[in-house]
């Protein structure tokens, strides 16, 4: 018995980006033919799993992506899409306490530059939109992180807020859902998504990372 939830979208890289959410339930039944009850009580293999040394590791992640942007339309409560595609670059440095083989948690320093941040509709500009200077499009934030660790894959969530920013779009409470795919023992690919206020789509986080001071025992 189980349940599955899925969200499909284009990651705010194109318009429209309405998204699709699905939820389903699963029920399964298994019957084993000709299995003897005494075989279940026997252990045929005795894997040696060393004790886990609890420790603090440090994840450094660099990411980038592209996005579309909708800005407030003057004189109405609606929004209009800005022309073009805008770049996003960022980093994350996260000291993580490793509790065991399956879970780690910690805090992260998050930095981002979003070329679409704080754009405004402006009839004085040639394309009809005003883009502020770079200092209004950068931010530093702090987030709490938790990660479920599996062989080759790690699924993580983060909740944070920007503490140094240029105001406007960058003054936000953000959420992160990320997948890390091991490439080597300490390096990984990073695929994530950033939300604002739990419902506003923000940007993809496609990047690479490296884990320092990794004392996790090698099992495979």
Predicted region positions:
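Transmembrane beta-barrel strands of outer-membrane/channel proteins
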Residues: 1-7, 56-68, 107-113, 144-148, ...
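Outer-membrane beta-barrel "beta-signal"
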Residues: 21-42, 201-220
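Residues on the lipid-exposed face of transmembrane beta-strands in outer-membrane beta-barrel proteins
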Residues: 1-3, 25-31, 91-97, 109-111, ...
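Outer-membrane beta-barrel translocator/channel fold
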Residues: 2-4, 11-16, 117, 190-220
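Residues that define the transmembrane beta-barrel architecture of outer-membrane proteins
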Residues: 19-25, 29, 54-56, 85-91, ...
């Amino acid at each position: 018995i189980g349940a599955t939830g899925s969200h499909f979208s284009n990651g705010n890289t194109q318009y429209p980006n309405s998204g699709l959410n699905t939820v389903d339930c699963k029920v399964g039944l298994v019957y084993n033919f000709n299995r003897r009850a005494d075989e279940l009580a026997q252990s045929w293999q005795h894997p040696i799993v060393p004790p886990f040394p609890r420790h603090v590791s440090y994840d450094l992640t660099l990411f980038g992506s592209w996005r579309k942007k909708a800005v407030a339309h003057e004189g109405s409560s609606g929004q209009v899409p800005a022309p073009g595609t805008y770049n996003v670059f960022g980093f994350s440095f996260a000291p993580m306490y490793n509790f065991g083989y399956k879970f780690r948690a910690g805090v992260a320093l998050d930095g981002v530059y979003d070329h679409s941040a704080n754009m405004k509709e402006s009839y004085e500009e040639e394309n009809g939109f005003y883009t502020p200077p770079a200092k209004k499009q950068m931010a530093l934030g702090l987030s709490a992180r938790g990660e479920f660790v599996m062989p080759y894959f790690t699924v993580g969530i983060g909740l944070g807020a920007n503490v140094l920013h240029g105001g406007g779009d960058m003054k936000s409470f953000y959420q992160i859902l990320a997948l890390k795919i091991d490439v080597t023992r300490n390096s990984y690919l990073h695929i994530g998504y950033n939300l604002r206020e739990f419902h506003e789509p923000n940007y993809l986080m496609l990047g690479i990372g490296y884990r320092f001071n990794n004392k996790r025992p090698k099992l495979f």
